[in-house]
């Protein structure tokens, strides 16, 4: 083989190796999330991405970021294929989410131009280790909110439910916790590079820093003590048939399952002293406010326990006047307080419907590509009311509950709104029947555990099929029902009024990260536009740090 041919073959092998490393680091990152929940794999996965992006040009950074994203999101979001019954939606959402990491790869190659060159022995690694996490978390913030409400699944924070870093969530929420994990990964990447280059002192410093970042948050104190007494709640998991779509097509089957479980609760004696019974999202397959038979069934359950029942129901309505892009009838996802003897009362309406799961943006355009969009016959619209429901206990106290339905558990701001409006416990009704056999329910439970710490509140998660669980304000699961069974849990849940530091800060950590990321990318792009070396002494373009081979 001639020398030019050998060089070309070596270049191909090198690029293929980079792609495989990018995909592999994405797969490693996925292992940090449920069901495996190997939290320590998260910083290692981030370190792998940082390593393959070192010194690359923008185009290579985009490709490698995309490869990492595909390795990460393909297994993480497989539950969408289970829900939709086909792989088209799964592949589409995987590609969309992976494009965000492609943008991250490109943005980081631009921002690296600001990093001091080889002459700055310590400053270069330090700047890289600090700047990369800012870009990572900024991308998380964007993809968790845009477009159409975003998709927060896969945020680094949600892999930390069992990690020693979890207490940091009480100080800075998912944003700060994710920033710490990404920082740990970036520090590890610098340590690996230093080890390869024989810089033992730098390797030791990076290893020590990574350990300190991982262990020190465990020293943060987490309040758990009740501040306003307790409330005894019963979480009812009625279960559905193996084929969820078929179960909901048989009128009132799901409702009857939850009525039976509630009646069993009352007959067992476990309902003694219970203040509230919580049913899951969509537990009433017909709206009891409109359907008389359903109302009779729900009233039967409420009378059996003698306390209010929180009922999940779908309300249908005519399309609001002046609303474009929505055709025909619309839906609202409600949780209704049903009091025995007086019926429906307060209502919480879901604020964050899931794009392509509960409503279809650009329906006419997408229908031209796939008729699958019409599986969602009517769009679910967001609610505009408050984020809390108030229930009266047996001893006459009015207790406000912060509510987040299903995927809303993954949105810090939705639950924060409920807590800041006075919610003393967080209630998460969810319907996981469409995800049977997938990792979605386990991921959602991990999200609930992180949110318990973020907001300093106990979380009661109630599912049609599981996972139904009670979570302490420290993020510990204190009770859990066996999935895919008719079951109930009874727990005395602490009521808390104080606001965590994370809730006091609100959206500001995310805003600061987004602003910093914007500055980094714009500043990194400026030298390239000007065709000049950055003005700061010793700073050179990233491609000059080492020979660029991709």
Which residues make up each language-model segment?
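Soluble catalytic domains of enzymes that build or remodel membrane lipids, polysaccharides, and related
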Residues: 221-505, 509
């Amino acid at each position: 083989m001639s020398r030019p041919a050998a060089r070309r073959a070596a270049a191909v092998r090198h690029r293929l190796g980079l792609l495989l490393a990018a995909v592999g680091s994405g797969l490693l990152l996925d292992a940090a999330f449920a069901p495996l929940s190997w939290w320590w794999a998260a910083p290692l996965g981030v370190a792998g991405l940082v390593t393959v992006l070192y010194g690359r040009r923008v185009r290579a950074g985009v490709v490698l970021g995309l490869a990492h994203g595909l390795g990460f999101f393909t297994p993480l979001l497989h539950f969408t294929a289970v829900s939709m019954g086909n792989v088209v939606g799964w592949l589409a959402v995987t590609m969309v989410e992976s494009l965000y990491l492609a943008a991250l790869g490109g943005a980081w190659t631009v921002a690296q131009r600001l990093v001091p060159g080889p002459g700055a022995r310590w400053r270069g690694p330090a700047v890289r280790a600090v700047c990369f996490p800012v870009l990572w978390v900024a991308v998380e913030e964007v993809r968790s909110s845009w477009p159409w409400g975003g998709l927060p699944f896969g945020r680094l924070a949600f892999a930390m439910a069992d990690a020693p870093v979890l207490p940091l969530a009480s100080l800075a929420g998912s944003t700060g916790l994710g920033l710490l994990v990404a920082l740990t990964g970036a520090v590890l990447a610098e340590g690996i590079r230093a080890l390869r280059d024989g810089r033992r002192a730098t390797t030791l410093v990076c290893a020590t820093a990574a350990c300190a970042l991982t262990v020190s948050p465990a020293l943060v104190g987490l309040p758990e003590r009740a501040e306003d007494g307790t409330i005894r709640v019963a979480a009812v998991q009625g279960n559905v048939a193996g084929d969820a779509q078929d179960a909901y097509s048989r009128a009132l089957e799901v409702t009857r399952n939850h009525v039976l479980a509630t009646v069993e609760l009352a007959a067992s004696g476990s309902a003694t002293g219970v203040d509230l019974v919580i049913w899951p999202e969509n537990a009433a397959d017909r709206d009891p406010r409109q359907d008389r038979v359903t109302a009779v069934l729900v009233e039967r359950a409420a009378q059996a326990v003698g306390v209010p029942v929180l009922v999940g129901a779908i309300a249908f309505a005519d399309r609001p006047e002046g609303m474009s892009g929505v055709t025909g009838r619309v839906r609202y996802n409600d949780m209704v307080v049903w009091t025995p003897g007086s019926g429906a009362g307060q209502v919480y309406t879901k604020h964050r419907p899931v794009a392509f799961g509960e409503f279809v943006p650009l329906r006419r355009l997408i229908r031209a590509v796939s008729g699958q969009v019409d599986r969602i016959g009517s769009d679910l619209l967001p609610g505009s009311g408050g984020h809390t429901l108030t229930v009266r206990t047996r001893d006459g106290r009015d207790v406000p509950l912060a509510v987040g339905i299903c995927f809303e558990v993954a949105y810090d701001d939705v639950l924060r709104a409920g807590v800041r409006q006075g919610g003393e416990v967080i209630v998460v009704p969810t319907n996981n029947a469409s995800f049977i056999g997938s990792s979605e329910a386990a991921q959602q439970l991990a999200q609930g555990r992180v949110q318990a710490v973020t907001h300093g509140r106990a979380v009661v998660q109630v599912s049609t099929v599981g996972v139904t669980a009670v979570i302490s304000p420290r993020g510990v699961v204190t009770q859990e029902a066996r999935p895919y069974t008719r079951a109930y849990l009874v727990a005395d849940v602490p009521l808390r009024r104080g606001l965590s530091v994370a809730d006091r800060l609100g959206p500001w950590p995310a805003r600061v990260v987004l602003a910093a990321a914007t500055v980094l990318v714009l500043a990194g792009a400026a030298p390239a536009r000007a065709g000049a070396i950055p003005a700061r002494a010793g700073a050179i373009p990233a491609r000059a740090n080492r020979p660029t081979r991709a």
